[in-house]
């Protein structure tokens, strides 16, 4: 299973669980309207806030590169959700075929060297927002999203790590008493998200199943 297929599969499961099966028709199980493009738009606006663009305050602030990664991953959740929705209502391809189609479209996914001109990065984000509302085409938009990731220094491998890390850690927490208040968040002096990042860094291309198992091993030692 490719990394793209893994992420699409995890997102489908997450949406089925949180929104209810049939969410592709535009409503949650509670009857709330879903608008993934609006989600993308608002997350993209938060991405812009990672830059010290304001001329009236915090003018000496630095670009928050760590938050840029976080926001790009959040946008990816919503891009995949829109991809899955449109696919279900139109082509209804199996996820494996959908993943191949996206991989063929986006090509090589290495990150570029980050430029000093962060205003150019902001403009690139705004160009992505424009595509949401002008001449929107799903595969082309997905390709543009990955072009933005490249410009902002986020590689596909790093995106994959961050995505499955967030997804699997949330599942792990729920499985181990997070809602009930019995979950232990600090493991031998380290927060669980730090342990998760260390596990991800120790093995390139780790699968969700491997990550969950390693988390269980570390948790049992806490």
What do the predicted segments below correspond to?
Residues 1-222:
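Flexible "arm" and connector segments at domain edges
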